[in-house]
């Protein structure tokens, strides 16, 4: 990387910067580092910021089973919903069915905050749309496998039908791998599918977060990166293109391997190389290839995870 040939990124306050991104595109795709306290604190602060509801019509989230959209609509409108029923919205997501990925308290807190803000303002904004496929665990393992294969397709369809078709704006919140401009999904992830149908509709934001197994392998790369970021005041956001950030190796954030949790709880590691539009493995992918803006929440070592109760794992 030739740092001298690239401009210095210009960070701004993340609250202002995220909202400003909607001037460029109707959809802002915010890659979520699952369970990350600092990122969910920022999301909470945005929910309390009146400018968010004035700017966006909907928030589309990965951590919600679309089967329960009517239930969450009633809850957010102020109806009483039994806690056991409400919990099904995020705990029965097929994306976290075996791993319990969405049982961290940050997801329940998200819905609680949206409800309290809407009721306080007597407003129906922002709407919350559940992006994970409709799935009933009582239908058995076959239903799980079917829904797992439909996650990106379904999420993209919700955005296209409920947001773009009406000329609306939306904030998407999902794991970064679902929202980057390159992915390991041959048919395309959420953003790739949306951009095929409506080029330029998305702005992609990637958080400064590295999975623990990658940290162990690439400490020198992370140290070099963080020396360049040490003057940034978190939370901050900056455009990536034409800066030295754009030249950073994207696999630092999007690992070329993934851990899958089998139905019996066994974890297996599989290769997940990033692909080009023709499905060919890409040898080198930079940050500018996968995202448009960089969200800095503090040094990696200072970040904390809100793990699900009773669960201790290396990474979400």
Whereabouts are the PLM-identified features?
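Compositional signal for N-terminal targeting/processing segments
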Residues: 1-316
